[in-house]
Amino acid sequence: MTDRYAVMGNPIEHSKSPEIHRMFAEQTGQAIAYERMRVPLEGFEPAVRAFFASGGKGLNITVPFKEQAWVLVDRRAPRAERAGAVNTLLAEAGRLVGDNTDGTGLVRDLTVNHGAALQGRRVLVIGAGGAVRGVLPALLPEAPGEVVIANRTVARAEALVELFADQGRLSAVGFDRLQGPFDVVINGTSAGLAGELPPLPDDLLAPGATCYDMVYGDQPTPFVRWARAHGAAMAVDGLGMLVEQAAESFLIWRGVRPESAPVIAALRPE
């Protein structure tokens, strides 16, 4: 019997998730089917209920439905509770359970795949939207020395600092007050895809700095290009994060963690 899984979003046509989970299934010998489901903007809850009522086993949720999924579930994993968003759903004893694997995906890609150190480091996070809130519950337990959240609207960054104040040394700042150097810089804005980077000072990076863009593309993103031009020792995009968060979802659903490296290599453009 083949178990059914899917990713729900709108738009969804460009999602790599079916390809990723197909490779995971082949690698681990799991019998699953995984599809894309484009859900009407007003039809998220009925689509989720219908999927599980028809025997579906698990869902990934992407934009714009992650916050709706957080509200919809009967129970949330602790990291999803703090994230304010859910990207992984499963049914347990008739109840809908929500988790968030985005932060774990980011941290595993940084530390396991790229060998970056976070403990004791000065970390800058650019942006204060849902993507950033989603990864802080996994980033902060890595014990960075300091985390600075920079955003055009400082009040949004301050709200995140208040929300996670018990998790470590955090501060909020506008781009006009940004002072380096930072050991790790994470871009959590989608503006990077459009080529519109926030105004970043030339002396932002410490020697040996790691720069990470949570978005990815077939070409180096504007932030990755900026990082390389400003002397980053390592500058990578978020393709590995995509694969690692999928691997974490697969582990939740199937009880086995697939190998991410061959999947990342298969997806990376030549």
Swiss-Prot record:
Its EC number is 1.1.1.25. Shikimate binds at S15, K16, S17, T62, N87, D102, Y216. Pfam families: SDH_C, Shikimate_DH, Shikimate_dh_N. One of its GO terms (molecular function) is NADP binding. GO terms for biological process: amino acid biosynthetic process; aromatic amino acid family biosynthetic process; chorismate biosynthetic process; shikimate metabolic process. It catalyses: shikimate + NADP(+) = 3-dehydroshikimate + NADPH + H(+). Disulfide bonds: none annotated. The active site is at K66. GO terms for cellular component: cytosol. It comes from the Bacteria. SUPFAM superfamilies: Aminoacid dehydrogenase-like, N-terminal domain (SSF53223), NAD(P)-binding Rossmann-fold domains (SSF51735). It is an enzyme of class 1 (oxidoreductase). NADP(+) binds at G127, A128, G129, G130, A131, N151, R152, T153, V154, A155, R156, M214, G238. Keywords: Amino-acid biosynthesis, Aromatic amino acid biosynthesis, NADP, Oxidoreductase. Pathway: Metabolic intermediate biosynthesis; chorismate biosynthesis; chorismate from D-erythrose 4-phosphate and phosphoenolpyruvate: step 4/7. Homodimer. PANTHER family: BIFUNCTIONAL 3-DEHYDROQUINATE DEHYDRATASE_SHIKIMATE DEHYDROGENASE, CHLOROPLASTIC, SHIKIMATE DEHYDROGENASE. Belongs to the shikimate dehydrogenase family. Involved in the biosynthesis of the chorismate, which leads to the biosynthesis of aromatic amino acids. Catalyzes the reversible NADPH linked reduction of 3-dehydroshikimate (DHSA) to yield shikimate (SA). This is Shikimate dehydrogenase (NADP(+)). It comes from Alkalilimnicola ehrlichii (strain ATCC BAA-1101 / DSM 17681 / MLHE-1).
